[in-house]
Amino acid sequence: MAVPKKKTSKTKRDQRKANWKHQAALEAQKALSLGKSILTGRSTFVYPQDEAEDEDE
């Protein structure tokens, strides 16, 4: 007979949610920073290009 799993505590749920939001905030900050640097021309970022796209052109 199937037995239900234990309920996850609110603390554990909140920790996971906080971690997820923190990681999302860091990625958003990196994306914004990259966008700003590209617009100002200070970027040293090189866009990766697929070899398949180069062959088509």
From Swiss-Prot:
SUPFAM superfamilies: Zn-binding ribosomal proteins (SSF57829)
Annotated GO CC locations: large ribosomal subunit
Gene3D superfamilies, sorted: Single helix bin
UniProt keywords, alphabetically: Ribonucleoprotein, Ribosomal protein
InterPro entries hit by this protein: Ribosomal_bL32, Ribosomal_bL32_plant/cyanobact, Ribosomal_zn-bd
UniProt-annotated stretches for the region Disordered: 1-21
Segments of skewed composition (Basic residues): 1-20
GO MF annotations, alphabetized: structural constituent of ribosome
Pfam families: Ribosomal_L32p
Keyword Ribosomal protein attributed: yes
Record GO biological process: translation
Protein family (similarity comment): Belongs to the bacterial ribosomal protein bL32 family.
This protein's name: Large ribosomal subunit protein bL32
